[in-house]
Every structure is written in structure tokens, then in C-alpha cells.
């Protein structure tokens, strides 16, 4: 590739591995990075369209759910075929067009099916006000993932490793959803 190993590593999620892995030993296996991850990438249609199809690595992390630049929730599914994006493709598949869905068209059958090819830049997303709690939470997580420890809220007096803060957030989130069955979430989104 002509790149130094450190340059290649910077283009991967390896720098997040120690903070987001709950495996006993951190490995380069992406499934260890995001246990029970849904298998696709979320994405900001505005970012995809503006960049000509560049997928940001941060979208792969389960902690990414909103685009701070465009103040919207990230999309997860193709607007035409309804499938999650960036799933593994067959080895014999032709490279997909940037910004377009690479999944086989839902209206065709057979081995050499045409692609869905929907323009992902046209995917509708929920836009949020600049001070919406979801965007504030995403900003806190972005800053946390870039740090060596959590130093906000209850962690301000006792800096805590990022991995432990993320584990606390997961446990708290699961507990809230379990206790309320999600009943109180309706008023949080526009």
C-alpha cells in the first residue's frame, strides 16, 4: 500500500479497541469491539452525499447514533430495500457505487441479481434542535472516546477509565429501558 503500519492502523478502529472491548483480551476482531452489534453501519445521509460516499469509521461504533455536524439521528436502513448498510458482500460482487445501497434488489432473484442501488444520500432522518439532549449525549460520548478517562458528572472527582464509564452507561441504559419498557421515550424525539 505504500503506507506505514501506523498510518494503516489510524484508518481502523484499533485505537478504540481498548476502550470499547469487553473481551478479556482485546483483539482486532470487530465483533469483540462491539459485542452484540447489529451487523451494519449507521450513517449520516448528508455526510455521505457531501463526501461522495466516504463512510466514517465512527459510524461503526455502537456509541455513534447522531451526526453533530448535521444535527440528525444517523440512518440505519436503505430507504428502498430496508436493509442495514455495509454488510459483507459476496467476493464475486462488483464494487458498489459510492453513496448507493449495495444490497441485491428486492425485486430480482437469482445469483447475479442487480443491486438495490438506492441513493443513500436521500435517506430521511430525524433532525434535532442544536440543544437536544440526544446531541448533547453524542457530544459527551465523542469526547469520552477521544479521552483516556471519564472526567464529567460523577466521574469528575474520580476519573474513571473510558471502558468502565461506557460499561456504566450501558448498564444504566439497559436498566432504564427494562424498568420502563421504553414508555417514557416517546416525548424525547420530534
PLM region descriptions:
Residues 1-63, 68-190:
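C-terminal accessory regions
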